[in-house]
Design a protein with these regions (language model features):
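Cytoplasmic juxtamembrane interface segments
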Residues: 4-9, 71-86, 151-168, 191-200
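Membrane-interface helix-loop-helix junctions at boundaries between adjacent transmembrane segments
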Residues: 89-104, 114-142, 148-170
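Short, Lys/Arg-rich, polar N-terminal cytosolic tail immediately upstream
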Residues: 1-25
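Cytoplasmic juxtamembrane regions at transmembrane-helix boundaries
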Residues: 90-97, 161-178, 240-264
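Helix-boundary and loop/linker segments of multi-pass membrane transporters
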Residues: 21-22, 127, 208-212
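Hydrophobic cores of alpha-helical transmembrane segments in multi-pass integral membrane proteins
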Residues: 28-48, 61-83, 99-116, 137-152, ...
Length: 282
């Protein structure tokens, strides 16, 4: 296996920064990353100005978190885009792969923004036929977004094989997001709330994430699951770095990546079981 610098991880043009490289790899997802980053800042500012609360936290807390999460989502997909087949995104399938998550994220974000601005819940809100339909559509959109990860992960592994550590880590991470994040998300969609026992408020939760400290919280497992697409490739990038410096062999890197991936999956499942038992994460 060549120890040459892997251009799939770093910019191919050393005169180009990371944002410039992302723009080259997938322009559409780059611009949506930028748009949701701006929206994240706007929601953060709105939360500082607007003193209204819902379930113990700012009404802008959920829009802020979702805008940030979607920005990271598109940045990640865009960074992996160069592992797809050449000109794949110019085909009908490629255009669908680009457009489906964009439309789903946009519609979901708009609804979350509107509900947040009104001080009304977007998730678990089935108080009227309209809200029930909207909640169902949000779930369908989220399912399509994680299905995009599955589609892309399988395509990358089929196109590039599993011998390259970086490629393998990307494939595992994307598929892991579908399995772990999507699996917990599916369960969440059928639940009445993200709390299991404990106080039904986000007030007093863990800093930044607001996870319950008085009972179980299903958002914990969902959070870690959907971020498999970042965690596992980061491990892969570290292993590539070690390979370049002859500090680990190819077989050792594969074993390490497999072990970490299985361990991460076990961790996500354990946090899910922990929440179901009504126990707080910390």
């Amino acid at each position: 296996m060549s120890l040459a610098r892997p251009t799939s991880i770093i910019p191919a043009d050393q005169n180009r920064n990371l944002l410039g490289e992302l723009r080259v790899r997938h322009p559409s997802w780059y611009y949506w990353t930028f748009a949701y980053t701006v929206l994240t800042v706007i929601c953060l500012a709105a939360g500082l100005i607007d003193e209204r609360n819902f379930q113990g936290v700012s009404v802008w807390d959920k829009p802020f978190k979702f805008a940030l999460s979607i920005a990271v989502y598109f940045a990640t997909l865009g960074w992996f885009a160069n592992l797809m087949q050449p000109d794949y995104f110019n085909t009908l399938r490629g255009k669908l792969l680009t457009g489906v998550p964009v439309v789903c994220a946009l519609l979901e974000m708009l609804y979350i923004l509107v509900q947040g601005a009104r001080g009304e819940p977007s998730h678990f809100n089935v108080s009227s036929p309209f809200y029930s339909v909207m909640y169902g559509l949000m779930g369908a959109g989220a399912a399509l977004m994680v299905a995009t990860c599955l589609w892309m992960g399988c395509s990358i592994l089929r196109n590039r094989g599993t011998n390259d550590i970086w490629v393998l880590s990307v494939g595992i991470g994307l598929i892991g997001t579908f399995v772990l994040g999507g699996g917990v998300g599916f369960y969440l969609g059928g639940a009445e709330a993200h709390w299991v026992s404990g106080e039904t408020t986000d007030a007093g939760g863990l800093p930044l994430v607001n996870w319950s400290r008085t009972g179980g919280d299903l958002r914990v497992a969902h959070f870690f699951g959907i971020h498999a697409m970042q965690v596992i490739p980061c491990v892969g990038a570290l292993l590539v770095w070690l390979r370049q410096r002859n500090r680990i062999g190819h077989l050792g890197a594969q074993v390490c990546l497999t072990s970490v991936s299985l361990g991460f999956a076990a961790f996500c499942i354990s946090t899910f079981i922990q929440a179901l038992r009504g126990a707080p994460f910390i």
